[in-house]
UniProtKB/Swiss-Prot annotation:
Cofactor(s) required for function per UniProt: [4Fe-4S] cluster; tungstopterin
EC top class, as a word: oxidoreductase
Enzyme Commission identifier(s): 1.2.7.5
Name by which UniProt lists this protein: Tungsten-containing aldehyde ferredoxin oxidoreductase
UniProt entry tagged with the keyword Methyltransferase: no
Superkingdom assignment: Archaea
PANTHER family: ALDEHYDE FERREDOXIN OXIDOREDUCTASE, TUNGSTEN-CONTAINING ALDEHYDE FERREDOXIN OXIDOREDUCTASE
InterPro entries documented for this protein: Ald_Fedxn_OxRdtase_dom2, Ald_Fedxn_OxRdtase_dom3, Ald_Fedxn_OxRdtase_N, Ald_Fedxn_OxRdtase_N_sf, OxRdtase_Ald_Fedxn_C, Tungsten_al_ferr_oxy-like_C, W-dependent_AOR
Gene assigned in the entry: aor
Complex formation: Homodimer.
A UniProt-annotated Pfam family: AFOR_C
Length: 605
């Protein structure tokens, strides 16, 4: 087999048993790897109704067949599990170097089962695997954990994925961090890791990923890298300004969510833009493994020193969504979240819900006491409550449940800007209605990455579409983006490659690496299979499409108050039935047997 090793580790933390399991190329041709392999294993082995924080839940850490190769952005890995935040499937994706190192060690996945009675970490050096005591690491922040493990093992070549105090304390939106500041961030994967008392996974590998046709692969890769470098976004805006290049673009288009999505225009957007960050604080770019784009930022602040980030989503979540414009405070807060192991989007979204509850009088000074008041623009709220959330102290214990549960405690869940209890990212769907349909139908909830309709609706990739068009063409484009994202994740590449590359380009790289002769349609069918399999998991876990596949009332009933999208709402009810029909599902959003048989997943019905 090429690309994949055809084997994965199964680590049972209840028994301490470590097993090597193998699989054949037939399985790889059906699921490709990574996100695909993971959902196959979860459906085959796990009850979707299992407690996300119980021993029955599985945590699967998995690179793809192109991870660790020279394919552009071939450093990605996925963390797939049942989310404690949503109760459904989640697939958190991260870059850096950890995923590539896991492939260099000779593994396609680590399947973590059970729960340890005491803190542990997993040490992997090629075929050597140990479960080690981590009692001395419990309580440490991410940078301290990485430094301590490298010192203990005696190697600076290690790449480490770990949780901070937020994961240890089962914060519903705790992240898994790797290589310092790279995050598998969303929907509480860090809490699942913490529930298993697994502090970290440290990996060192010395193998080379097997390639079917090395010369052809090298030529294909060179061609794709050139396409990316010649693209105005992948080769221009992202390398120059990072993902924060989007701040001004999204604000000018009137969908930069401000003050908990009350409007889509922020008067201080430029002050927190990529252009402003580059001028004030940037030291250098920080690319992930094999990445020709290099969107990562390394900044230096007088108060903090050198740190990585923040990305566009983090700038917005810890900035405009809270009415905060001070970029230095945002960078400091992002650093805090990375060290504690918190998802910045959900952290900011939860604090924004608290601010609106405070603004409307439902959260009062009597409850806050001496704590900073939840006023829009108050930077003290950031630094004070981020730590409180990570350690579940005082009001932080309630905030650690996420915005939906927090707002529900005060009788007003409508102030949670979330889908399936996962906080929405930095695009108001009233300014991109196809993107809004993507939020509603995303398998992991309020996510932008897996259905990035901002590309056609705002940025013009692969071509410009009217953001307020809700035709079948728009719905079909969303379905293509969802299936393609599943394929790219399963391959082990970054979704930013879609700026410059199309489905045929992924086909070329995969065929050269794996030695297959698949068509573009064959690969997109794998993506469709993965998307449907994840939905099947959710349906078995209790997904009620009529109740769960919607948007916050604000987007459906409250017209955008200002800017280019003034007067618009999301016409979800007009799009959703057509989405189900074009997916080949029933009118109530379920997968019929004939569709499951077409995709080869009927065994899981």
């Amino acid at each position: 087999m090429y690309g994949n090793w055809g084997r994965f580790l199964r680590v049972n933390l209840s028994t301490g048993e470590v097993k090597v399991e193998e699989y054949g190329e037939e399985l790889a041709k059906k699921w490709l790897g990574s996100r695909g392999l993971a959902i196959y294993l979860l459906l085959k082995e796990m009850d979707p109704k299992a407690d996300p924080l119980g021993p029955e839940n599985k945590l699967i850490i998995t690179p793809g067949p192109l991870t660790g190769t020279s394919a552009p952005t071939g450093g990605r890995y996925n963390v797939v599990t049942k989310s404690p935040q949503t109760g459904f499937i989640t697939m958190a994706n991260s870059g850096g170097y950890f995923g590539a190192e896991l492939k260099f060690a000779g593994w396609d996945a680590i399947v973590v089962e059970g729960q340890s009675e005491k803190p542990v970490y997993i040490y992997i050096k090629d075929d050597h695997v140990e479960i080690r005591d981590a009692s001395h690491l419990w309580g440490k922040v991410v940078s301290e954990t990485e430094a301590a493990i490298k010192k203990e093992i005696g190697s600076n070549k290690l790449h480490i994925a770990s949780i901070g105090p937020a994961g240890e304390n089962l914060v519903k939106f705790a992240a898994i961090m790797n290589d310092g500041h790279r995050a598998a961030g969303r929907a509480g994967v860090g809490a699942v890791m913490g529930s298993k008392k697994l502090k970290a996974i440290a990996v060192e590998g010395s193998k080379r990923v097997p390639i079917a046709d090395k010369q052809k692969f090298m030529l294909v890769v060179r061609e794709k890298i050139n396409k990316l470098r010649n693209d105005p976004v992948a080769g221009g805006g992202l390398p120059k300004y990072g993902t924060a290049v989007l701040v001004n673009i999204i604000n000018e288009n009137g969908l930069y969510p401000t003050r908990n999505f009350q409007t889509g225009v922020f008067e201080h957007a430029y002050e927190q833009s990529g252009e402003a960050m580059t001028a004030k604080y940037l030291i250098r770019n920080q690319p992930c493994y094999a990445c020709p784009i290099g969107c990562g930022r390394v900044n230096k602040l007088p108060t903090l020193g050198v740190t990585e980030g923040p990305e566009y989503e983090s700038i917005w979540a810890l900035g405009a969504n809270l009415g905060i414009n001070d970029l230095a405070s945002i960078i400091e807060a992002n650093h805090q979240c990375d060290e504690f192991g918190l998802d910045t989007i959900s952290t900011g979204g939860t604090l924004a819900a608290a601010m609106e509850l405070y603004e409307k009088g439902y959260l009062t000074d009597d409850e806050l006491g001496d704590a900073p008041p939840f006023r829009w623009g108050n930077t003290e709220v950031l630094h004070y409550y981020i730590e409180k959330i990570a350690y579940r102290k005082d009001l932080g214990d309630k905030l650690a449940e996420g915005s939906y549960r927090f707002a529900e405690m005060y009788g007003h869940p409508e102030f949670s800007m979330s889908v399936k209890k996962l906080e929405l990212p930095a695009y108001d769907p009233r300014g991109a209605e196809g993107h809004g349909l993507g939020y509603a139908t995303n398998n992991r909830g309020g996510c932008h990455i897996k259905n990035y309709m901002i590309s056609p609706e705002i940025l013009g990739y692969p071509y410009k579409m009217d953001p307020h068009d809700i035709s079948d063409e728009k719905v079909k484009m969303l379905i293509l983006f969802q299936d393609l994202s599943a394929l790219i994740d399963a391959a082990g590449l970054c979704l930013f490659t879609t700026f410059g590359l199309g489905a045929d380009d992924y086909r070329d790289m995969l065929n050269a690496a794996l030695g297959w002769d698949f068509s573009t349609e064959d690969y997109l069918k794998i993506g469709e299979r993965i998307w449907n399999a994840e939905r099947l998991f959710n349906l078995k876990a209790g997904l009620d499409p009529a109740k769960d596949e919607t948007l916050p009332k604000r987007f459906l009933e409250e017209p955008m108050p200002e800017g280019p999208n003034k007067g618009h709402v999301v016409r979800l009810k007009e799009m959703l039935p057509r989405y189900y029909k074009l997916r080949g599902w029933t009118e109530d959003g379920r997968i019929p047997r004939e569709k499951a048989e077409e995709l080869g997943i009927a065994e899981f019905l």
